[in-house]
Amino acid sequence: EDETVAAAELIGKAFCPPEAPMPTDALKARIDAFLEAHNTLALATGCGKWVRCTPLEYLRVDGRLYILTEGGLKFKGIWWNGAISAAVFDSYAGMASLAGLQMTGTAVYIDPLSDEYRSVIEARGVQLQQLQQMHAMLHAVRLDITHYELLDGALRSEGYAARQVLDLG
């Protein structure tokens, strides 16, 4: 099964490369701007034949992507293997304005006693007193993204292919 998936990925890369790729720095800037313009993603996790996709608000702190959550079934996949896929997208209004970002990477649970956790909570505007009064633990999860696929119909007018790929790992 793993060999079949690996073969399909190789075929996809060989036969479907971006036609007119953007320079890497310009693509990174475009991805950053897209993420800054949105605040909700669909996060998919899984293990074995079980998968879960959850809509979540996200925030960015020091260029990193985080979610805050009280828990739920998404943690089954996060604890099992950490592998995630996430998507951020605009409402569909036609091919010319089609815009979405698919991301693949790893979910990293942030220790609630760490400085990183405090930074994320503060960036979200949550006070320590509020955390103590909550009925459930507020978990912070960092999404370490290694692969981005941006689909943006507006790129065609700039001379680039609508589909752009940024591989960081």
Give the location of each predicted region:
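Charged, gly/pro-rich active-site loop segments
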Residues: 1-23, 98-169
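A short beta-strand motif that forms part of the nucleic acid-binding face
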Residues: 71, 82, 155
